[in-house]
């Protein structure tokens, strides 16, 4: 199993770090989550799935793999409407706090 974080989507809440501090960390100074391990040990699979399910912005993706099989994502790789909306909203933000409206 592998786990990846969509760092553009990460809300910097730190929920994943609170759930599994040895697997996730928040980088300085922006607080965006990072994965600390290349592959997840078998003993932590359930906890990683829990962390992914608890992410408030659904930025964590668990990639399951079976020996000899191609990797497959645990969730549909297509974005949900809510996730697409969050990405669109984040893409429209302009640094400095101005949202671009007149």
Curated annotation (Swiss-Prot):
Gene3D superfamilies: 3.30.70.20
Keyword 4Fe-4S appears in the UniProt entry: no
Compositional bias segments (type: Basic and acidic residues): 82-93
Pfam families: Fer4_15
Record keywords, A-Z: 3Fe-4S, Electron transport, Iron, Iron-sulfur, Metal-binding, Plasmid, Transport
Residues covered by region (Disordered): 66-102
InterPro entries: 3Fe4S_ferredoxin (IPR001080), Fe-S_cluster_ET (IPR051269)
UniProt keyword annotation of Protein transport present: no
Gene Ontology MF terms in the entry: 3 iron, 4 sulfur cluster binding; electron transfer activity; iron ion binding
UniProt cofactor note: Binds 1 [3Fe-4S] cluster.
Binding residues for [3Fe-4S] cluster: 10, 16, 55
Essential cofactor(s): [3Fe-4S] cluster
Purpose of the protein: Electron transport protein for the cytochrome systems.
Full protein name: Uncharacterized P450-system 3Fe-4S ferredoxin y4lB
Species name: Sinorhizobium fredii (strain NBRC 101917 / NGR234)
């Amino acid at each position: 199993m592998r786990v990846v974080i969509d760092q553009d989507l990460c809300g910097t809440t730190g929920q994943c770090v609170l759930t599994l501090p040895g697997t996730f960390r928040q980088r300085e100074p922006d607080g965006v989550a990072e994965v600390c391990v290349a592959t997840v040990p078998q003993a932590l699979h359930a906890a990683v799935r829990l962390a992914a399910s608890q992410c408030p912005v659904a930025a964590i993706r668990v990639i399951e793999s079976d020996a000899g099989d191609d990797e497959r994502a645990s969730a549909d790789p297509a974005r949900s409407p809510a996730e697409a909306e969050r990405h669109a909203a984040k893409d429209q933000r302009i640094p400095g706090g101005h949202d671009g409206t007149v």
